[in-house]
Amino acid sequence: MPIDSGLSRRHILRILAGGAALAAGARPSEAGEARIGRLIGEAKTLPTIAQRIDFISGALRGTTYQGYTLIGGPRRPEQFVVRDDAFDCVTFCETVLAAARARDTAEFETALREIRYRNGIVNWFERNHYFFEWGQHNVANKTCRWIGMDGAVDMEKMVDSQKGLSKRRFAMRVIPSAIFLAHKAVLQSGDIVGFVSRRANLDYFHAGFIAFARDRTLLLRHASESRRRVLDERMDRFLAAYRVRYVTLLRAEQPAAAVAVKKAI
């Protein structure tokens, strides 16, 4: 079967607001531009979205970690940026999820816009800045669903760590880490795990995908700031190293039909 790798520079880096050229640091490599298109073509033969997420995220291991790759601000026009040569933890999750939902690069771009922004509107104030809102938004648009476990508890957070946004009050249902590790059997490769912050004014400090080693050891597949790349590491060790008390889980929904390709806003 021929592989779709037609991801041109203009297509993958279309600027949807402002009209200015992207900064040089926001450009992917030429090899990176072709990589997402190739992975979409290979992954679309897999029957479930969990398998596609596992395949695509695994293929991106080794990619560089880089924070602050998105462009925009309260007083700066938002630009729709796609990076497949560098990720932070959230752009890694949303790029993989969009690619897993797509059958070609046009669907990928649409899916990524719908995942990153409320109603797919490319505007800084519509971007899902807090990961709890990212989850809420992507449950509402049927991209994901929340996964609970017996023993989960309620938590309320008042967050204000993002400059330019008003305070938000989040009522969260969170899973204690010990319960999470004890219920490995209910997890699937490709589930999205969010790590709840110990800070009072922040919802999460990190996110990544569930993965499994061949011996079924539970792994975290993520864009690691400390290790500066996308990698797998043992979940129990990550939880211990960062003294994680609570997590939340999202599971990607199987797309009911092709992602509708919308005209850029």
Give, region by region, the residue ranges found by the protein language model.
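A mid-sequence, solvent-exposed acidic-amphipathic segment
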Residues: 156-198
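Low-complexity, Gly/Ser/Thr/Pro-rich intrinsically disordered linker/tail segments
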Residues: 217-227, 236-265
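Solvent-exposed loop/turn segments at secondary-structure junctions
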Residues: 198-202, 226-228
